[in-house]
Amino acid sequence: MSDDNQTKLEAADIQALLAVLPHRYPFLLIDRIVDIDGDVSATGIKNVTINEPHFTGHFPENPIMPGVLIVEAMAQTAGAISLLQRKTGRPGVVYFMTIDNAKFRRPVVPGDRLLLYVKKIKQRANISKYECVAEVDGVKVAEAEVAAMISVADENL
C-alpha cells in the first residue's frame, strides 16, 4: 500500500489497457503490462501471432514484425503506465512526440513473445521521455527513446 492508502498497481491486463488507451485492433500492440513501478517503469508484453494483418505484406514468405510497430508497442507501454497512474478521473490521451536512437538488432517473428521494458528518464510538465528496450527470449531485438505528451481537455497538468 502507498501512503495515500490506495493499492499499488503492479500489473494491467487487457481490460485495463482498453480502459486507458484509445487503440483497438489492429493497432493495439500490447497485451498486458507487468512489473509496474508507478509511471517510472514497467514491462509490456506483446504476443506476436501470424494472424496479425501486417504479416500478409511484411513479408508473405518470411513474416517479420515491422520495426515501426515494435517502437509503437514501446510507446503504447509507456503511454499506458502514464495514463494508469493519473490522479484525476478525467480521460487523457497520450500523443507520441519523438523517437530517438532507434536501433533494430534482430527480426521479430510470429511465435515470439516480445517483452517491452520502459523506464522514464525525463519529465517536464506533461511531457515524458522513456528509454525503451524490446527483448525476445532474453535477447535485445530493439531499443529506442520515445517522448510523449499527455493531453487532457480543461486540465492544468
Curated annotation (Swiss-Prot):
Active site: 58
InterPro entries: FabA_FabZ (IPR013114), FabZ (IPR010084), HotDog_dom_sf (IPR029069)
Entries under Pfam families matching the protein: FabA (PF07977)
Gene3D superfamilies with a match to the protein in the record: Hotdog Thioesterase (3.10.129.10)
Coiled coil: none
Enzyme Commission number(s): 4.2.1.59
Main location: cytoplasm
Location relative to the cell: Cytoplasm
Keyword Lipid biosynthesis: yes
Cellular component, GO annotation: cytoplasm; membrane
Known catalytic reactions: a (3R)-hydroxyacyl-[ACP] = a (2E)-enoyl-[ACP] + H2O
Single GO term (MF): (3R)-hydroxyacyl-[acyl-carrier-protein] dehydratase activity
Keywords (A to Z) from UniProt: Cytoplasm, Lipid A biosynthesis, Lipid biosynthesis, Lipid metabolism, Lyase
Biological-process GO terms, alphabetical: fatty acid biosynthetic process; lipid A biosynthetic process
Similarity section: Belongs to the thioester dehydratase family. FabZ subfamily.
Cross-referenced HAMAP family: FabZ
Protein name: 3-hydroxyacyl-[acyl-carrier-protein] dehydratase FabZ
The organism of origin for this protein: Brucella abortus (strain 2308)
UniProt gene name: fabZ
